[in-house]
């Protein structure tokens, strides 16, 4: 008890627990006591080595942490850094914990500590126990597992996390005022800091310690290292990363990150002495009488563990027990602080400080002017939170269960200290060794550290472990003292083997290493450094580095988000800080931030820019508030944030557990709250003076004499310090402490080894005992077996064998049944019911693919035709018209061509050509700007297809053949391609978006209604006591299933996402609505509301269905033949599409199946044989005596039943090993045919098609039993209902399962046929090992007892799939079937025949067991399923049409529930049954569905010839060229003297000749002046003739009659050419000619030369026709009456001028061309005036109109009338050539069209009305855009131009219709216009004129006005 009282750091280690177990460790029985009023505490878990250290009366109680930073907490009491070599930390990590010795016991020193001279070094008289780092994955349970003691010395399992503010709150007696001799403050350099690497290095097994280096030499190489927090030396492992250079060195405080080499000097900047980060500097009192001597604990090394790549901790250390009481050392020697000397490890124990890239550690430096380096933030697992005095650490501990180390304390500006790290003396470094660097802090002007880290040969970074000389207490030093440099030596990498890793890491090497040289060298270094150690100047205490709000806001400027969430805890407000990365990742603690920064290296954002303190007013603040919708996070305003920050500030922490607390001794000296603990000064005494002082302090009570001795010792020590005589004492203490530590390490190592040996011995003994026990048991079993074997007769063995076979049979049967349950390839199933015979589409002639494209086109035009300008009622062709047009039948070809033109126009507009084809031109014009016609659309289509990468073969065909000459399927594919491209146009996309928006609104409203309806039904059910299901109809029950909405929401994944996004809205509104609905007063009112909402729900459902079906067709699935079932939005019925062209050839399937079959069967057989071995061993003792054949077994009923008939519990047990027998390959094997069986199936095809022989009774019985089995497979999973039902299937009907074989098999013996199942079992096992080769190939060698089946057996075992009538019979008697009869035949000739079993399984068994023949059939069925039956050819092609709802019901019944495809099809058909019935009942008006005979179409498809179609097109182009020639001549536009040749289109020697397509000869080729010969043209090819005649025509058109685009006047150039003449000519040999030409003419000629199709020639022809100025022709004549130039054949030319008049426009009407001359009215008027000679009595026009007399033409002179015969102006208007042939003569008599006399008068009246002065408002239709409201008032508009068009095309059948339209014009005018307006007055004038003229023409006739 006395020793325990003296144990100031007593605590017991926790038992080891799994890191991730989540169990809360039980508290230990240790008790922390106080000595001199200051506690010393070391948390058990956590990777930080901070502890509660008594420093100048300041207790630095650190919370548990998992950070990789090794912190020690010695506090200096001087204003300068007084570092004593004997006062330092030995921080050795990565080694497991070892038991500690009792400090009061006289046990031998631990082996680890014994390696150091002097044994152990107690701390404050007590050896401080080392701490065990927590497991990497134990971050969530660190506090619960740590042992910390607070003010009362009570131990608690809860770790205490606090900062300076918390420390202040916890100690009211303490303060942090700065005394003259106060603790030093530390500052760090703002330069870059080396960081820990993330990989592992191996270390040399040994190294020597180099001689110490003078401080002046060491000052040459400097780098930032470790600083102390509150006087604590912070150890950082300086490592350079080799594999990740971006993580090696990081810029600090805005500096550029740099990667330092291994021997590179790192300059360290001196911090600004004028800047201080202290928030509240204070002074410490000068009185030092009661100040305890500075004490420190020696930190024990940890066991090294293998690095874990994904561990969460930094070092990857597992939890082990802390040092126990028995391992603590005596208290004789005074403590010293040794430098942290860590030799490198050897190769055997390479370890990593970083488990992965996120587990990094580095030295952290806090600067008063700049934030810490990135190494602090990026390369730490759990890093610091740099908040000033904040409680962020505890907040985060409470909310996140993760600990962070305390923040750093930064130096005061006036403090001067130097941290120097001297490199090794030898620059040469071995690639596998790392120097042990000793880090010494000296009070120099600036902190300087000179590291030297050696490279490693492997990918591991060696941890350079430094020895940190912590600042000692300077309380006893005078205010004025000399500055003594403090340096340390760095061991050389070429050190001798005496400096072994075992010195510091005893487990690193098994060999014993001598550490004497290491200790001597260290002592020398300490002697050197101790000579000049002084204290200088006093300064303020600097608190730790904090992150300013400006720094915390920096990440927010780079895409980060910071959120502080505040909620009310049990006693106070709690704040939690969350960070969101730029990618949206949420981070709640520093390890996540560091890991993110390490993986995403960002140079501008570092670790110091983050703070998890909720009191930092940066980011968004959210508060948890109770709202009507529940608890929600509400964002706080800027005014609310300060009050919330004050609310979460205050005293925090968990109250003590008073039940487990022990009474503590009240400290003798009380200190105020926040006052730092007093620092002991025993370390400053020499050994002689310190020993009695320690002995006296260790005692419980001190008498007056002892107190006087202590005071004397202290006074003596202070005098020594003042005289500077304590230097040698410090060096001696350091030397002694190292010896003690070395000794203790050796002792602990020896203890551990002995303990491990004992454990190994115990384990070996236990194993030996177990082995002996097993041998004894085996011997006993063997003896029992031998006795049983000797006692039993020989028949016992036969019975055992039979039992084993029966069990094997059951296992095999169970496996087969399990396989039969699985979904299978539909064509592998043999028990299909026949599908209904669907009727094919009646009028379908096109191939299947072409009809599919036609359906796509029609549905697209119906859905989106209005957007593209189509009128669905007129412009959308039906399927019948589309089919006729594709087959070039009748007038439908023109409609298809017009459809192509309109679709291509829309596609050229949007989406248009791709970007790389935008500049494509033909004849100098952009392709998209060329006017499309039926004649040239083929060439534009070819360019469009080429631009979009359509197959080159089609484009090449279009180069020489027009669109209409292509096969029907190609034309349908082209139209479908245009439709698909238009689907991506902006118009279509916008239309789809509108539809989706409307669907979204409908769906939202439907959900709201459904939610309210559901709540009302719930309320009604509660009030009436009925269930909700009773109140819902069948439709509602189905509607509540999610699958019922699929038909409504077939718009795809985007709508499902829409559903998820909107699904929350109705739920929130629903609560409010439900509250309102629930207040309904009575049940009838609820029922009325339910009825009303049900109607609304039905309305929205229909609207949603209508909107969704407009978007796309619905695929219901596939049947067994892979036919697809389609439901189209506008067409009636269900369409079934064959799989033409989609089936894989059977040969390919066979080849692909071979390897799969072998693998599947090979994996099946070992499981079967292993199963047999297991059964043989387990059922030996369960054998029963032999019984006669036919007798029931004398066994228990449970064991007699087969496995599938046992109780559920036993069935489950039996199924577990069976699951092992089903390899994955078997899942896919049924979908592939087996070649051998397929071959035999083909060889016996004729046999399989037979109907079979008459059935026997036994066959029917077997069919019924199998039907029951199949029903069980489909309907239930219970094993007890195998034979309870009898459902007949097509396969189970009589005569379809066991057809008669082609050859009668050998008659088997009755015994063999009925009793033995072994042949069938062997056949099944052999089938799994058969090769997948052809039948003639011999199988590989197998065991002798495994016969192979014959081909005939395989064929005869194949069941048929033909429907027939079922004959149900009673399943009582069973007889042998042909399948069973084949068993002896298979056994015949087998040399290694298995012995016959005395018991048979062929007979019917009692107690419900099925017969073995049934399972034989199951085996055969299982093997049959491995072969997929071929799809019948008639099911592969074509389209079917389902119109009858009854056919749909029959389809549902016939689908197989086990087929992969038919199962899904059945699901969809049943789900959408009502909707599909509505679709089937739609009216169908398409002619293709009308049954009719189409022999002509069939013949057209069979005799389709593209050459004939192309020849017809080429001939039409030739005729068009000839017409253009005639038109030019008739217009006198040709060069004088040129006449067109005779027509070639009437020649009989014309023949089609196809030109080979050449890409260089393409008309889109842009080459100019292309040289080379033109393509050879043949005079018998219509296309070549058209090209030659067109070229000649262009050259002979007068240039002055040409215009743009071929003849721009500003581009005309004059070219000259020399023509050579014959030599014999008297003139010169050459003749120079000049001609005009334009570049467009040259391009036109080149393009014409390269034309190879009619469409290309039409393009050239059309451009030439547009370039001729027809209006400049002298013969350009228009009718004087109608002012039109059409109908040239009826245009009568005046003999006096070039005017003319149509013979039907002349008044009175002319029946024929008059003889003699004819003069127009203008000429007659001029004759009256004397310009022309006129006969007397010739009336004028005006007189004629009034009198109504006819004109009399004179025939006095010989001039003849002219009739202008002109061709059509455009290719699409009028006939291209005359029926009687064209003549160049000017006059030709033409037969007059037979006009009705009344309609002729109508034409005259209309002509006169159009020429009237008041007719201007009625000449053209009224534009509704210009005249608003016209269409709303005038329902039937009419005008004179519309009347003329109708009159010319024969739209009027009588004059009454004409008069009605004329009066309609005037009535509309009177209705819309006022009478006094101009238009109204004109209408009245025209009405009077029309009525007067009508009376003149119809005098004596009743006019129907």
Curated annotation (Swiss-Prot):
Keyword hit for Transcription regulation: yes
Domain MBD residue range list: 546-617
GO annotation terms (biological process): chromatin remodeling; DNA methylation-dependent constitutive heterochromatin formation; DNA-templated transcription; heterochromatin formation; negative regulation of transcription by RNA polymerase I; rDNA heterochromatin formation; regulation of DNA-templated transcription; RNA polymerase I preinitiation complex assembly
Record-annotated membrane-spanning stretches: none
Signal peptide: none
GO MF: DNA binding; histone binding; histone H4K16ac reader activity; nuclear receptor binding; RNA binding; zinc ion binding
Post-translational modification: Acetylation at Lys-680 by KAT8/MOF promotes its dissociation from pRNA, affecting heterochromatin formation, nucleosome positioning and rDNA silencing. Deacetylation by SIRT1 in late S phase enhances pRNA-binding, allowing de novo DNA methylation and heterochromatin formation. Acetylation is high during S phase and declines to background levels in late S phase when the silent copies of rRNA genes are replicated.
Keywords in alphabetical order: Acetylation, Bromodomain, Chromatin regulator, Coiled coil, DNA-binding, Isopeptide bond, Metal-binding, Nucleus, Phosphoprotein, Repeat, Repressor, RNA-binding, Transcription, Transcription regulation, Ubl conjugation, Zinc, Zinc-finger
DNA-binding region: 649-661, 670-682, 1186-1198, 1404-1416
Modified positions (N6-acetyllysine) in chain numbering: 680, 799
Coiled-coil region list: 693-792
Domain spans labelled DDT: 848-913
Segments of skewed composition (Acidic residues): 1306-1315
Region (Disordered): 1-59, 362-434, 648-792, 1178-1220, 1283-1318, 1330-1412, 1734-1755, 1769-1789
Subunit structure: Component of the NoRC-1 ISWI chromatin remodeling complex at least composed of SMARCA1 and BAZ2A/TIP5, which regulates the spacing of histone octamers on the DNA template to facilitate access to DNA. Within the NoRC-1 ISWI chromatin remodeling complex interacts with SMARCA1; the interaction is direct. Component of the NoRC-5 ISWI chromatin remodeling complex (also called the NoRC nucleolar-remodeling complex), at least composed of SMARCA5/SNF2H and BAZ2A/TIP5, which regulates the spacing of histone octamers on the DNA template to facilitate access to DNA.
Annotated protein name in UniProt: Bromodomain adjacent to zinc finger domain protein 2A
């Amino acid at each position: 008890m006395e020793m325990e009282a003296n144990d100031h750091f007593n605590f017991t280690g926790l038992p080891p627990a799994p890191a991730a177990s989540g169990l809360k460790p039980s508290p230990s029985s240790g008790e922390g006591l106080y000595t001199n009023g200051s506690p010393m505490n070391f948390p058990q878990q956590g990777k930080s080595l901070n502890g509660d250290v008594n420093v100048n009366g300041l207790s630095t109680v650190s919370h548990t942490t998992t950070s990789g930073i090794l912190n020690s907490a010695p506090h200096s009491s001087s204003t300068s850094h007084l570092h004593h070599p004997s006062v330092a930390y030995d921080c050795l990590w990565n080694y497991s914990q070892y038991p500690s010795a009792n400090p009061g016991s006289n046990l031998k020193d631990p082996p680890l500590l014994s390696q150091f001279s002097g044994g152990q070094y107690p701390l404050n008289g007590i050896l401080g126990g080392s701490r065990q780092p927590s497991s990497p994955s134990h971050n969530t349970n660190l506090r619960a597992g740590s042992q910390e003691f607070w003010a009362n010395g009570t131990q608690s399992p809860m770790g205490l996390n606090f900062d300076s503010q918390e420390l202040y709150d916890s100690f009211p007696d303490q303060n942090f005022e700065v005394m003259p001799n106060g603790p030093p403050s530390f500052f760090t350099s703002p330069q870059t800091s080396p960081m820990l690497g993330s990989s592992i290095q191996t270390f040399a097994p040994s190294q020597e310690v180099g001689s110490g280096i003078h401080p002046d030499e060491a000052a040459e190489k400097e780098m930032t290292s470790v600083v102390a927090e509150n006087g604590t030396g912070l150890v950082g492992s300086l490592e350079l990363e080799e594999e990740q250079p971006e993580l090696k060195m990081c810029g600090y405080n805005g500096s550029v990150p740099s990667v330092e080499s291994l021997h590179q000097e790192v300059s360290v900047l001196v911090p600004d002495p004028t800047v201080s980060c202290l928030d509240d500097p204070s002074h410490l009192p000068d009185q030092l009488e009661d100040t305890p001597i500075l004490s420190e604990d020696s930190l024990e090394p940890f066991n090294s563990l293998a690095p874990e790549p994904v561990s969460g901790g930094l070092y990857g250390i597992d939890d082990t027990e802390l040092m126990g009481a028995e391992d603590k050392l005596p208290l004789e020697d005074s403590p010293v602080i040794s430098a942290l000397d860590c030799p490198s490890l050897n190769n055997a124990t390479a370890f990593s400080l970083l488990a992965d890239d996120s587990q990094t550690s580095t030295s952290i430096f806090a600067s008063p002017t700049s934030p810490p380096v990135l190494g602090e933030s990026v390369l730490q697992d759990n890093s610091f939170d740099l908040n000033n005095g904040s409680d962020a650490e505890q907040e985060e501990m409470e909310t996140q269960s993760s600990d962070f180390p305390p923040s750093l304390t930064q130096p005061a500006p006036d403090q001067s200290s130097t941290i120097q790290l001297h490199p090794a003396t030898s620059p040469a470094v071995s690639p596998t060794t790392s120097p042990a660097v000793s880090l010494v802090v000296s009070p120099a002007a600036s902190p300087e550290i000179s590291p030297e880290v050696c490279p490693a040969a492997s990918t591991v970074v060696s941890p350079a472990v430094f020895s940190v000389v912590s600042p000692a207490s300077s309380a006893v030093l005078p205010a004025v003292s000399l500055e003594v440099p403090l340096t340390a030596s760095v061991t050389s990498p070429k050190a001798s083997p005496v400096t072994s890793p075992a010195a510091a890491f005893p487990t690193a090497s098994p060999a014993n290493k001598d550490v004497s040289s290491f200790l001597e060298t260290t002592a020398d270094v300490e002697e050197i450094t101790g000579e000049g150690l002084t204290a200088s100047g006093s300064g303020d205490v600097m608190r730790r580095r904090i992150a300013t709000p400006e720094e915390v806001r920096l990440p927010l400027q780079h895409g980060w988000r910071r959120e502080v969430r505040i909620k009310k805890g049990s006693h106070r407000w709690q704040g939690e800080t969350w960070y969101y990365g730029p990618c949206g990742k949420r981070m709640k603690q520093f390890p996540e931030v560091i890991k993110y920064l390490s993986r995403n290296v960002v140079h501008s954002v570092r670790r110091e820019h983050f703070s998890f303190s909720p009191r930092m007013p940066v980011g968004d603040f959210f508060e948890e508030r109770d709202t009507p919708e529940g608890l929600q996070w509400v964002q706080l305003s800027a005014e609310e944030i300060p009050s919330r920050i004050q609310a979460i500030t205050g005293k925090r922490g968990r109250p003590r557990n008073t039940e487990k607390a022990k009474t503590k001794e009240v400290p003798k000296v009380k200190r105020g709250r926040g006052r730092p603990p007093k620092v002991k000064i025993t370390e400053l005494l020499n050994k002689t003076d310190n020993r009695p002082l320690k002995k006296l302090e260790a005692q419980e009570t001190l008498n007056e004499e002892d107190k006087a001795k202590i005071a004397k010792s202290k006074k003596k020590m202070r005098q020594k310090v003042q005289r500077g005589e304590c230097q040698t004492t410090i060096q001696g203490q350091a030397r002694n402490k190292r010896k003690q530590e070395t000794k203790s390490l050796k002792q602990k190592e020896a203890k551990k080894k002995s303990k491990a040996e004992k454990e190994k011995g115990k384990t070996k003994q236990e194993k030996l005992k177990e082995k002996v026990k097993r041998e004894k048991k085996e011997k006993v079993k063997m003896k029992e077996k031998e006795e049983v074997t000797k006692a039993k007769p020989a028949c016992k063995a036969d019975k055992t064998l039979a039992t084993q076979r029966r069990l094997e049979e059951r296992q095999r049967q169970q496996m087969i049944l399990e396989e039969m349950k699985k979904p299978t390839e539909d064509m592998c199933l043999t028990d299909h019911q026949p599908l209904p015979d669907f009727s094919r589409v009646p009028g379908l002639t096109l191939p299947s693919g072409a009809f599919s494209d036609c359906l796509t086109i029609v549905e697209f035009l119906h859905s989106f035709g209005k957007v593209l300008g189509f009128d669905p009622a007129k412009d959308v062709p039906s399927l019948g018209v589309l089919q006729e047009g594709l087959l070039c039948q009748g007038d439908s070809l023109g409609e298809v061509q017009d459809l192509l033109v309109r679709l291509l126009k829309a596609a050229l507009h949007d989406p248009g050509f791709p970007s790389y084809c935008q500049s494509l031109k033909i004849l100098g014009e952009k392709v998209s700007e060329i006017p499309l016609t039926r004649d040239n659309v083929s060439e534009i289509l070819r360019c469009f297809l080429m631009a979009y990468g359509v197959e080159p073969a089609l484009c090449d065909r279009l180069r020489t053949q027009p669109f209409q000459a292509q096969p029907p399927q190609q034309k349908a594919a082209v139209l479908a391609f245009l439709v698909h491209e238009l689907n991506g146009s902006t118009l279509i996309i916008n239309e789809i978006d509108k539809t989706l928006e409307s669907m979204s609104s409908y769906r939202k409203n439907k959900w709201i209604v459904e939610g309210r309806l559901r709540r009302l039904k719930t309320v009604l059910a509660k009030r009436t006591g009925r269930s909700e299901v009773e109140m819902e109809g069948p439709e509602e029950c189905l509607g509540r299933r999610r699958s019922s909405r699929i038909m409504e929401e077939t718009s795809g994944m985007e709508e499902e996402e829409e559903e998820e996004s909107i699904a929350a809205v109705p739920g929130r509104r629903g609560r409010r609505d439900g509250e309102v609905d629930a207040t309904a007063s009575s049940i009838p009112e609820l029922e009325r509301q339910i009825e009303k909402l049900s109607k609304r729900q039905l309305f929205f459902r229909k609207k949603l269905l209508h909107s969704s079906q407009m978007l796309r067709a619905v695929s219901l699935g596939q049947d067994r033949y892979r036919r697809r079932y389609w439901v189209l939005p506008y067409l009636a019925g269900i369409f079934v599409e064959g799989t033409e062209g989609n089936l894989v050839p059977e040969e390919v399937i066979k080849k692909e199946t071979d390897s799969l079959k072998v693998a599947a069967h090979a994996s099946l057989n070992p499981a079967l044989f292993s199963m047999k071995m297991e059964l043989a061993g387990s059922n030996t003792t369960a054998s029963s005596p032999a019984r006669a054949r036919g007798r029931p077994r004398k066994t228990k009923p449970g064991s007699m039943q087969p496995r599938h008939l046992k109780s559920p519990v036993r069935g489950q047990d039996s199924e577990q090993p069976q699951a092992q027998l089903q390899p994955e390959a078997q899942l896919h094997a049924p979908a592939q045919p087996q070649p051998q069986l397929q071959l035999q199936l083909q060889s016996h095809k004729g046999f399989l098609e037979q109907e079979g022989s008459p059935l026997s009774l036994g066959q029917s019985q077997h069919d019924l039993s199998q039907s029951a089995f199949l029903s069980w497979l489909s309907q239930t999973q219970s094993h007890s209902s195998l034979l309870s039902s009898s459902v007949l299937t097509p396969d189970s009907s009589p005569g379809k399962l066991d057809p008669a074989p082609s050859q009668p098999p050998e008659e088997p013996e009755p015994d063999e046929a009925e009793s033995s199942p072994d042949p069938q079992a062997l056949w099944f096992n052999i089938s799994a090992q058969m090769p997948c080769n052809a039948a003639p190939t011999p199988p590989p060698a197998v065991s002798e007892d495994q016969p192979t089946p014959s081909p005939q057996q395989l064929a005869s075992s194949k069941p048929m799939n033909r429907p027939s009538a079922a004959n149900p019979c009673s399943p009582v008697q069973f007889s042998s079937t042909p399948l069973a009869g084949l068993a002896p035949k298979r056994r015949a000739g087998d040399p290694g025949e298995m012995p016959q079993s005395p018991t048979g399984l062929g007979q019917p068994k009692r107690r419900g067991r099925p017969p073995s023949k049934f399972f034989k059939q199951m085996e055969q069925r299982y093997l049959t399923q491995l072969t997929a039956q071929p799809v019948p050819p008639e099911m592969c092609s074509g389209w079917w049409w389902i119109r009858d709802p009854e056919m749909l019901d029959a389809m549902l019944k016939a689908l197989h529930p086990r087929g992969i495809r038919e199962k899904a099809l059945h699901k969809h058909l049943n789900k959408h049954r009502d909707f599909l019935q509505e679709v089937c009942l739609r009216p169908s008006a398409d002619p293709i569905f009308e049954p009719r005979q189409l022999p002509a179409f069939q013949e057209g498809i069979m005799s389709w010839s593209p050459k004939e179609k192309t020849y017809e097109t080429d001939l039409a182009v030739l005729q068009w060229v000839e017409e253009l020639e005639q038109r030019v001549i008739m217009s006198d536009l040709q060069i004088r003297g040129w006449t067109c040749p005779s027509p070639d289109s009437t020649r009989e020697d014309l023949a089609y000749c196809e030109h080979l397509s050449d890409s260089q000869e393409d008309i889109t080729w842009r080459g100019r002046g292309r040289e080379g010969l033109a393509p050879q043209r043949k005079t018998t090819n219509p296309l070549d003739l058209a090209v030659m005649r067109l070229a000649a025509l262009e050259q002979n058109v007068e240039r002055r009659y040409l215009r743009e685009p071929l003849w721009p006047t500003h581009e005309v150039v004059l070219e000259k050419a020399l023509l050579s003449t014959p030599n014999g000519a008297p003139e010169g040999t050459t003749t120079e000619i000049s001609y005009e030409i334009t570049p467009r003419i040259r391009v036109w000629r080149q393009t014409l030369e390269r034309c190879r199709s009619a469409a290309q020639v039409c393009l050239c022809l059309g451009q030439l026709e547009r370039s001729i100025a027809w209006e400049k022709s002298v013969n350009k004549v228009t009718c004087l009456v109608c002012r039109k130039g059409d109908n040239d054949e009826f245009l009568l030319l005046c003999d006096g001028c070039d005017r003319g008049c149509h013979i039907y426009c002349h008044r009175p009407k002319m029946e024929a061309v008059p003889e003699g001359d004819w003069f127009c009215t203008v000429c007659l008027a001029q004759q009256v005036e004397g310009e022309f000679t006129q006969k007397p009595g010739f009336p004028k026009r005006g007189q004629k109109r009034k009198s109504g007399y006819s004109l009399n033409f004179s025939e006095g002179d010989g001039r003849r009338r002219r009739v202008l015969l002109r061709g059509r102006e455009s290719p699409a208007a009028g006939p291209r050539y005359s029926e009687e042939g064209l003549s160049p003569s000017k006059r030709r008599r033409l037969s007059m069209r037979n006009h009705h006399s009344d309609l002729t008068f109508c034409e005259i009246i209309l002509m006169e009305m159009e020429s009237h002065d008041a007719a201007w408002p009625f000449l053209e239709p009224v534009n509704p855009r210009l005249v608003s409201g016209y269409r709303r008032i005038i329902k039937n508009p009419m005008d004179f131009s519309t009347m003329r068009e109708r009159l010319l095309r024969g739209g009027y059948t009588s004059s009454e219709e004409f008069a009605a339209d004329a009066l309609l014009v005037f009535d509309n005018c009177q209705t819309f216009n006022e009478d006094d307006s101009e238009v109204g007055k004109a209408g009245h004038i025209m009405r009077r004129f029309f009525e007067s003229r009508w009376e003149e023409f119809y005098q004596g006739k009743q006019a129907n006005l």
